[in-house]
A protein has these predicted regions:
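Short Gly/Ser/Thr- and Asp/Glu-enriched loop/turn motifs at secondary-structure junctions
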Residues: 174, 470-472, 597-601
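His/Asp/Glu-rich metal-coordinating catalytic cores
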Residues: 40-122, 127-341, 359-373, 392-396
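Hard-cation-handling environments
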Residues: 253-383, 387-556, 560-572, 580, ...
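Conserved hydrophobic residues forming the short capping helix/wall of the S-adenosyl-L-methionine
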Residues: 159, 456, 591
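C-terminal tails and terminal domains of large nucleic-acid-associated
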Residues: 572-608
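Short glycine-rich phosphate-binding loop at a beta-alpha junction
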Residues: 144, 440, 602
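A glycine- and charged-residue-rich anion-binding loop/surface
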Residues: 68, 92-102, 106, 117-118, ...
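Intrinsically disordered, low-complexity RNA-associated tracts
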Residues: 1-56
Length: 608
């Protein structure tokens, strides 16, 4: 019973006096925390800490305005936190059905609408498909251009033709130099390509790091400038790359791209084969490495060197001025001096490797070059493979040169060209080094983009993290997702002479129509009150038939027009558009029955 009373006395629930409770309290707290028996007053309560909302991931928008689904016209806009930058601004040469068009450039509507947000234009390298549209963009608004030394030099040359070089701000950059533009920090990374000073860009933003490779390959024995900076690419891969935008040009080709050293061996053998003949070599004017190789071989062989073609002359002059090309004193001569030397003592380096109609080699093949006449004493080398779509043009030039008696070496007849773009194994290495979360294949037709996407998937990148975008896509990236937003304006703007954008699909359709079936013009003078024919109708044709051999056809056509005009008078048709339509339809039907052709018919009715 005593034990029971003791327990009752120390129990928290016992009704013992207050003094007895306070005496027992220390014993109760010795081994454990005393439970609270009262609540704090509301005015003394500790407020609950509000739960912090999860911070929204910062998005970055990528807007490709060119270069997807096509080879050329490369242009990409990045936007983050209200700041924008542009990478590249190139052109593409017209398809064969774009009659009279000189070049095609991106649609600048979107960038003009956002010009106040744009902090600068960054250029990966100096090829036309990456710099060719810059003059047309600068005609819209001014912005600073960031590029390596040679790239800026080539752009400056181009802008001088447009009178824009003096007022354009150029910022020369070097690999590993950080550039701060708004919320973006950009680092150029050296890559191999068929032109010196090519770079990729690592673009840091609050959303993460994006790497855009530009045009690249991985050449372990390059002629100059060193190997692609694989260590910097790997460092970014270790830190974490949000997305990779990579060159897809050679995505269908297995293996590695051959080294430029291979070309030197092939051309050296051809120099020996030429013996006592004059050597003419056509190559890309922008391929400074290739031109330097040819110059070095010419010096070894004791030959003088001349250049032909405006872009070849301009590019080589710029490369010499900036120290990218070295020509021994006394080696370079003018093209007008070629005939002052024996054939075995000269080499002519020229444009025209892609069969361009107005190029120097094309003019030689058509005997319209003012200084150079091709004949049996010439040994001609085309040191480039035809770009898809140019095969017929190149073949036409080769045939023309052969007919003149020259010996012509082209395409697969020797190792005279290697690509400047990465093949599958190099693309895999780029993906493996950078380890991107998201992958966007760029710079290629759809089949090449698709193949590059499959290559990325084979390396373990989830298919949900691979996106084949289109020109005008609004690609939205965060650390958590990749998605498409509302598309922006993008497309092709055709340049014809001084006209920019004034040639559209309707004009091209008319030009195609004229090229296929020709033109027939109807000229008649009619009374403005009665509609009766006062003079004519006369018919004039161009590109339709040879009139002297088709007089019966043209006489019949004139009768058809007269009858159509008479019926309009009889039926009191006074609306001149209706009259023209009736005449056009009647003549078109007659001509098609007689010839199975549909020339463009243009009625001209003059009222008196």
């Amino acid at each position: 019973m005593a034990q029971s009373k003791e327990n009752t006395a120390t129990s928290p629930r016992s009704k013992a006096p207050a003094a007895e409770k306070s005496a027992a309290a220390p014993a109760a707290q010795a081994g454990e925390k005393r439970p609270r028996t009262t609540r704090r007053p509301y005015y003394n309560r500790r407020p609950r800490r509000p739960q912090q909302p999860k911070e929204a991931a910062v998005p970055i928008h990528i807007y490709p305005l060119g270069g997807l689904g096509e080879v050329g016209k490369n242009m990409t806009v990045y936007e983050c936190n209200g700041d924008m930058i542009i990478v590249d601004c190139g052109l593409v040469f017209p398809d064969s059905d774009m009659f009279g068009v000189d070049m095609v450039i991106p649609d600048f509507t979107f960038v003009v609408q956002n010009k106040d947000k744009i902090k600068g234009l960054l250029i990966t390298h100096g090829h036309e498909d990456h710099i060719g549209s810059i003059p047309y963009l600068l005609q819209k608004f001014d912005l600073p251009i960031y590029g390596t030394r040679l790239t800026c030099g080539l752009i400056r040359n181009k802008l001088e033709e447009f009178g824009l070089a003096g007022k354009t701000k150029f910022v020369e950059i070097t690999p590993k130099q950080k550039i701060k533009l708004g919320c973006f920090t950009i680092e150029p990374i050296h890559v191999n390509h068929s032109i010196p000073d090519a770079v990729a860009f690592a673009i840091d933003s609050p959303a993460g790091t994006i790497i855009q490779t530009g045009d690249f390959k991985i050449d372990y024995t390059p002629l100059a400038c060193g190997v692609t900076d694989l260590s910097t690419l790997a460092e970014y891969g270790q830190r974490g790359v949000l997305a990779l935008l990579s060159d897809s040009t050679n995505a269908e080709r297995p293996g590695f791209t051959a080294t430029e050293q291979k070309v030197a061996a092939g051309v050296r053998n051809l120099f020996a084969r030429a013996r006592n003949k004059r050597i003419i070599i056509a190559t890309f004017a922008s391929n400074i490495y290739r031109v330097q190789q040819i110059i070095d071989l010419a010096v070894e062989d004791g030959r003088k060197v001349a250049f032909s073609g405006r872009s070849m002359v301009n590019n080589t002059a710029m490369a010499q001025e900036l120290g990218y090309m070295h020509i021994p004193e006394g080696t370079l001569i003018g093209v007008e001096e070629l005939n002052q030397y024996p054939p075995e003592q000269v080499v002519l380096i020229t444009t025209g490797s892609q069969g361009e109609p107005l190029s120097a080699l094309s003019r030689m093949a058509s005997c319209s070059h003012r200084q150079v006449r091709v004949g049996p004493g010439d040994f001609i080398i085309i040191s480039a493979n035809p770009i898809p779509g140019n095969e017929k043009s190149v073949t036409k030039i080769v045939n023309g040169l052969l007919l003149l008696g020259a010996e012509v070496i082209y395409e697969s007849m020797y190792d005279g060209h290697v690509s400047g773009h990465a093949c599958q194994e190099e693309q895999k290495l780029m993906l493996t080094l950078t380890r991107p979360k998201y992958f966007l294949p760029v710079h290629g037709e759809y089949k090449q983009l698709k193949k590059h996407a499959l290559t990325a998937a084979s390396l373990g990148i989830p298919t949900n993290n691979i996106l084949i975008a289109e020109n005008g896509s609004n690609v939205i990236l965060t650390k958590d997702e990749i998605k498409l937003g509302e598309p922006v304006t993008a497309g092709a703007v055709m340049v014809d002479g001084l006209g920019v954008g004034d040639v559209g699909n309707v004009v091209l359709r008319d030009r195609k129509h004229l090229s296929e079936d020709g033109l027939v013009i109807i000229v008649a003078t009619v009374d403005s009150k009665t509609g009766k024919v006062l003079a004519g109708p006369d018919l004039v044709s161009r590109g339709f038939v040879y009139v002297r051999e088709n007089e019966s056809l043209m006489d019949g056509a004139q009768s058809i027009v007269e009858n159509a005009l008479d019926r309009c008078v009889e039926e009191h048709v006074r609306d001149w558009n209706s009259v023209k339509t009736r005449v056009r339809e009647a003549l078109s039907s007659y001509i098609y029955r007689r010839t199975k052709r549909s020339p463009m018919i243009l009625p001209i009715l003059m009222e008196v």
